[in-house]
Each structure stands twice: as structure tokens, then as C-alpha cells.
Amino acid sequence: MWYSTVSNPRIALIKQGYHILAEYNLVKEELKNIYAIPSYACALHWFGVIFVHSGIYAGSVFRFSILLPDNFPEDASLLTVVFSTVILHPHICPQNRTLDLGHFLKEWRKDQHHIWHVLRYIQAIFADPEGSICTGQAASGDLVVMDEVSNMEALNMLAKSRPEYIKRVQEQAIASRNHIYDRPLTDDPHYIIVEPYCAERHLKFVDQLKSPCWKEATSMDCSQPSEYLGHIDSSRQLDEEEANQLEKLHRTRIVESHRDEAVDSV
């Protein structure tokens, strides 16, 4: 017998679980230097961390949470991204530490948008903060910036006092690294824990993984494997990653359509 998702919340919950699992699979397979995973306690709450390797934010390590709407992905409401610490950036509110996604998305469309789009946007605003506030170029050649953002002080500093902005950001980067190994504030087993590199311990995991790229990196010299992590240094690389994601997404949708048919027939 066929049951609608309206009259059977259990079926709706199962479908939501499949969607979130598909989102996680897309995230974990392609994106570099940014990691996100649903919490064990609630799949609508994701833990995330980004390692910035280039630009004026280079050396920064920022933790964040992603909160999905209760009716994700059907709800048109945008996701909520909240950083764990105060970050100097035009698009991050200094009071509640939330990222303004309104300049990137107007509403959530489940057939077009995915969590990895949001993660890629997070990478982009740190890789090119000037580009994230620019709306065009004046006849004089000066950049035209947005009239209103979440942190107007950061906007004005970036546009008019760039050296001071860079100084503040670099101080912030040092502080972020000093706290990356802090004990977690939650006992959720999916919380992303970062440990100091220990060759004796971590190389054992490398051997167990049998990953050629890791073995090649660790055999080059005595440098830590983290130095060989991929970098997002250009818009071209971001575009290539998006193309790979879209191809993978097409294959995933085919599988999901068959799965939804099977669930609806229960």
C-alpha cells in the first residue's frame, strides 16, 4: 500500500535521512581543506572546520556549525552557518558569529543547491575577501563595494585600511591555531578533533589506509604530511571541483530516484 509523506512522518524522516547521507557523501569525496559531518546526536546539526592555506587568511583554522532547517531539503529557508569564534570578515556578524548567505543564495532550492555549495562559498570568502564584497568597478578603476554587510567595520577597514585589516587577520590566525587542539565542548562522537602530528602514531594509520598519494607525500622528505594537502588557490581549481561535483551529483540523483520509488512503495 502506498503512503504519502504527509500522512506518514516516518517515511518523510527516512527520505530526509537519505538526502542528508547523499549530501555528506558529496562533501567528503571532493572538497579539500574544509571538512563537515553530521553530528551523531542530530543529522540536522553538522560540525565543520576549515584550514585556510592561501591569501590574507592563510594559516587560519576556523571551526563552525551548520544548522539545517527541520524540513530540509524541502524548506526554502537557508542553512545557518555559525562560527565557533569571532572572525573579522565583512560577511560574518561580530555579535552572533553567523555567516550571511544572503549575498550568495536568496532561497534554498533542493534541486539546485547542496551543502557543498555552502562549504565552497565559505572557502571563497576567505580566499578572496575583496572579491566577496565587490559589486563592480567605477570609471576611475576603483572597486565598488557593497552598501551593507554583516560587519560594516570590517568592510570599511578592508576597503580603506587594508594593512590594518591584514594585521588584525594575521593576529586572528595565530589565535585560531593556538586553540585548534582545545578539548571539545561536546562529547558527540562525530565532533571533528584535530591532533598534533605524531609520526609514530599517524604513519601507522597511513599504512593502514594504503593510500598511494599519502605514501608518496610521506616518502618525499621528513616534512609532515599536512604540508602536502591540496590547496584551493584559484577560481579555476574551484570551478574544476564544481564540475566534478556536478557529475557525481548526476549519478547520485539517479540512485536516489530509484531509492525514493522503493520507499514510496512500502
Curated annotation (Swiss-Prot):
InterPro entries: UBQ-conjugat_E2_core, UBQ-conjugating_enzyme/RWD. It comes from the Eukaryota. Residues 15-178 form the UBC core domain. Pfam families: UQ_con (PF00179). Belongs to the ubiquitin-conjugating enzyme family. FTS subfamily. This is Protein crossbronx-like.
